[in-house]
Amino acid sequence: MNNSMINPAITDLLKKVDNRYSLVVVTSKRARQLVDGDEALLESDIVKPVSLAIEEVNDGLISYETIREGIK
């Protein structure tokens, strides 16, 4: 049983992305898109953009690409 107060739990969200940094970046960029007027990818009563973005990540509705270019 997961005793996290955050729903969904961070451990569950980390199964959808590469690492914590990616989770923060993907979630924040998606939340910004929602604030700027993009339509939600799921039907929900959630009104907070960050909470909605987290749910979209958890449901596997958000994809991203990791670019592995370093400083040259």
Curated annotation (Swiss-Prot):
Molecular function as annotated in GO: DNA binding; DNA-directed RNA polymerase activity
Record's catalysed reaction(s): RNA(n) + a ribonucleoside 5'-triphosphate = RNA(n+1) + diphosphate
Documented EC number(s): 2.7.7.6
Assigned keywords, A-Z: DNA-directed RNA polymerase, Nucleotidyltransferase, Transcription, Transferase
Cited InterPro entries: DNA-dir_RNA_pol_omega, Pol_omega/Rpo6/RPB6, RPB6/omega-like_sf
One of the record's GO cellular component terms: DNA-directed RNA polymerase complex
BP GO annotations: DNA-templated transcription
Sequence similarity: Belongs to the RNA polymerase subunit omega family.
Assembly: The RNAP catalytic core consists of 2 alpha, 1 beta, 1 beta' and 1 omega subunit. When a sigma factor is associated with the core the holoenzyme is formed, which can initiate transcription.
Its biological purpose: Promotes RNA polymerase assembly. Latches the N- and C-terminal regions of the beta' subunit thereby facilitating its interaction with the beta and alpha subunits.
Name of this chain's protein: DNA-directed RNA polymerase subunit omega
Native organism: Clostridium tetani (strain Massachusetts / E88)
Gene designation per UniProt: rpoZ
